[in-house]
């Protein structure tokens, strides 16, 4: 009987070759959960805790170590151009003043630039990331503390300090920090004291006058002794002539005179 039932199922329920079954059974039930991590055995936990690697503490804290050097960056053409311009400014100008570049209006900046240009004083602005490396490698490295934030350079071929200070006084919110004149570093007070000095033609005139006076005094001192000697000789000759005339008039020698041997 079992064989007959199996034959009926094989013949009637099983699908024939090349045909899909009209009825398909689906299994419903619990599935294996693989999302949860399997708990480690307690003996293995003990073994892992005992054999855990403990790295040695460093002798110096990593925060105290110097940062690794950054890779050198390739210079672009603009930086090379600015560096050459900065080198030309410091080489061709005797006066270099450093000011704080405050937020001036375009009209005020243009007016001040025009007033400075009348006295052949030029206004230059360079980025600090290009200017500071140049100063570090030059003889002007003591000017580095002045370059904090946005700065402005006032340069001229001749030291026109008096004119520059007079123009900057009209702009009180543009502070003068310092600078250098003829490779001599000056502070703000040094620039003000320099502006109070007399002009070069006046000093040259005073120097020429002093030298002329000294020359005249030297000339008079050199002429004093010869003139005095000449006067004494003239007086001596005149006295001798008077004595000779007295002797010739009396016909006998003067008793005061002593004859030559």
UniProtKB/Swiss-Prot annotation:
Q: Which UniProt keywords apply?
A: Mitochondrion, Ribonucleoprotein, Ribosomal protein, Transit peptide
GO molecular function terms attached to this record: RNA binding; structural constituent of ribosome
Transit peptide start and end? 1-28
Per the UniProt entry, the effect of residue 166 to W is: Found in a patient with intellectual disability and ataxia; uncertain significance
Q: Kindly list the places in or outside the cell where this protein is found, as annotated in its UniProt entry.
A: Mitochondrion
Q: What GO biological process terms does the UniProt entry carry, in alphabetical order?
A: mitochondrial translation; translation
- Region Disordered: list its residue ranges: 242-261
Q: Per UniProt, what is one Pfam family of this protein?
A: Ribosomal_L10
What's the main place this protein lives? mitochondrion
Q: Name one GO cellular component term.
A: mitochondrion
Q: Which domain of life is it from?
A: Eukaryota
Q: Please tell me whether the keyword Nucleotide-binding is annotated for this protein.
A: no
User: Mind telling me which InterPro entries this protein's record contains?
Assistant: Ribosomal_uL10, Ribosomal_uL10-like_sf, Ribosomal_uL10_bac_type
Q: Extract the signal peptide range.
A: none
The record's subunit annotation is: Component of the mitochondrial large ribosomal subunit (mt-LSU). Mature mammalian 55S mitochondrial ribosomes consist of a small (28S) and a large (39S) subunit. The 28S small subunit contains a 12S ribosomal RNA (12S mt-rRNA) and 30 different proteins. The 39S large subunit contains a 16S rRNA (16S mt-rRNA), a copy of mitochondrial valine transfer RNA (mt-tRNA(Val)), which plays an integral structural role, and 52 different proteins. uL10m contributes a single cysteine residue to a zinc-binding site with mL66.
* Protein family membership: Belongs to the universal ribosomal protein uL10 family.
**What is the protein name stated in its UniProt record?**
Large ribosomal subunit protein uL10m
The protein's organism comes out as Homo sapiens
